[in-house]
Amino acid sequence: MTAAFVTIDPDRCNKDGICAAECPVKILGFPGKGEMPALVKGGEVLCIRCGHCVSVCPTAAIRLEFLTPKDCTPVDTHLLPDEKATRHLLATRRSIRNYKKEPVDKSRLEELVQTASCAPTGHNSRSVQWLIIHDTDEVRRLTAMVADWMRYMIKEQPAMARAFHLEETVAGFDLGLDVICRDAPHIVVACAHKAAPTAAIDCATALAYLEVAAPSMGLGTCWAGFFNIAATFWPPLKEALNLPKGVSNHGAVLVGVPRFRYHRIPPRQAAAITWK
């Protein structure tokens, strides 16, 4: 790294120290109002590449070795939902368990995953990786492997199998009723390398973003808990997924075009809040 890791245009800089105040790891020093911010010694090593400094500067005065203001999308306040719209959006989220048989184009799924990838990650590690199982026949094949795992659990760990109603689930599956993957056309799996310290929460957060974004694209989702557990512990399914070495799955969702439309928002139990 060189001194050019951070470049501040003196003609544009307001010398207000906003960039230094917003830097989460404090690698920008600010002597005081009227002075130019500057990179602290060794700061380039500590930078987590979040882009806060470039994003928050009102005059686009700062650029980094890897990021300039021109690389960024301007914030359009007209596109931001207000408080009422945001609450309505979140309240209308439903777990979709009935899907049309039509497949979703790969380009649409990629767009959805790109949106989900805007989710925050611990220390801005950007640790989340994605596996998209697009082939519906492959989804059916993998679903059958989950059923095999359930049969194993019924035999070897009956108490846990009873707790999760696995016997009933398998019985339904054998009769053609898929309550494992709900006959969804696609599955999206969020993964991360085992070395990532916040891998599990990063993947869960990204999948939450994905399910909130999906309806805007005419898509529905449902968390695939049985699939994710089986993918974690059942060797045949782990082998079939063939994740890169050192990478583990931390969550999965079913994705497809909803068969039905919801018309009302059921009330939710009031939040349990403790004030200190």
Where are the predicted features?
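Acidic, surface-exposed loops and disordered segments
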Residues: 1-276
